[in-house]
């Protein structure tokens, strides 16, 4: 199902859950020592000042994209709504794919999106790697209690014994080894005495469980790899399914909000927490996991593998290419953080899978930019218009609102002269029916200026129109008493040729022409939109100063911003953020 329209206020089933939890005082007695830790540490803390605790737990192995923005908005937003705290936690348990570069980029992206984790007097920025000692201690406790064992089988053997959805698994020959033996092997793993892949720690649960995730899942594996924060201190690393619940509990998380692919992992999440709480390692009340459908959108891919392929093979100009769905790409394109938050607020939080049409994001951008964006004029495909009866050396001032929604913003002023630039599409040698712009003999208004009558045009040797001639009606200037003395059906925009500012303008569109580029067995590269970027040399209204961060609505064309990477005062580069209307609508 594709959602093409959005309610003004989207539903969020998590609100009902949290309201019920708070009404039932489920977190009464919960304590917080001011930092994450086991039960013994939290017992000495004060009552938790946060009514609820959520978390956004990215793995630092790539750049955040629009799908992550949804999770960020859900977790930070719902914590704020209920007087709680949201932690930013880096799930850095896979050293071979993670890097400090991504940590820094994620912090920057979350801050840019408008969220802060310093909300209760603490810096609630955490790393899973800070809990490695706790995790190891807990692993030994689980072995001693008979809840875990070290398996010396190969990964292929373990996989073969796992069973299927219709057949139970088979017990490992190491499943019933003495706890002391498993402890010895685990310590050898920690001390680097075994090669990668030779031993794993597994939970002892039920190989006949209908949920395959409870068939003695792997908790630790040997990986002789340097970690970006801990260096070579560790050569065993926890699996995510084991680390995730432990991290939540150590941080006092109340509502662990995940996407739907983790739903089948919830029984193991609960099993781990219950075992460790019974052993006195984790404080009650324990976190609970809840799932919602991930943000699936038309016309984009969010797979890290596919995004990396686009970058490495040169289909886009880096992770911040304005066509990319990364937050840095959207930011460079000119999408505002408030527009992305608005879009996320308009999409429901539910357990039903749906695909959101990209037009909803574009509309959120328009709705966000429209009230406060200064208007201006640009000519993207210039054609010279000469007003033959206007004095050659004369210039006068025309005025227009900076923003029609904000009278207090005042007027902008720009020059009118004999030679102007107009859009090539605003002239026709032979006009089709219902074409009300310039053609020989027709009257149009130069917006904010005069009414003119087309008197002729000039072509080059190839037959291309190079110039249009017209005469102006002196008593028809906009804003003067005679402005309405002549009625016309057409208005066109223009800039003074002698005063206009030259600029490179990049007309960005959707990266993919297919609404479902990653659907089925498609080659997603074959779905790329060949017209996702067009570069033109344009002329801008002279008051349009291309300063960093500047954004305008160019009348009739759309919203544009200064490119943060390639633009300079001497050579402005502008990006089209979004058109005024959905150009992809059927």
UniProtKB/Swiss-Prot annotation:
GO terms for molecular function: ATP binding; glutamine-tRNA ligase activity. It is found in: Cytoplasm. Keywords: Aminoacyl-tRNA synthetase, ATP-binding, Cytoplasm, Ligase, Nucleotide-binding, Protein biosynthesis. ATP binds at residues 59-61, 65-71, 259, 294-295. The keyword Ligase applies. One of its GO terms (cellular component) is cytosol. It comes from the Bacteria. Pfam families: tRNA-synt_1c, tRNA-synt_1c_C, tRNA-synt_1c_C2. L-glutamine binds at residues 91, 240. A motif ('KMSKS' region) lies at residues 301-305. One of its GO terms (biological process) is glutamyl-tRNA aminoacylation. PROSITE patterns: AA_TRNA_LIGASE_I (PS00178). A motif ('HIGH' region) lies at residues 58-68. Its EC number is 6.1.1.18. It catalyses: tRNA(Gln) + L-glutamine + ATP = L-glutaminyl-tRNA(Gln) + AMP + diphosphate. This is Glutamine--tRNA ligase. It comes from Bordetella avium (strain 197N). The gene is glnS.
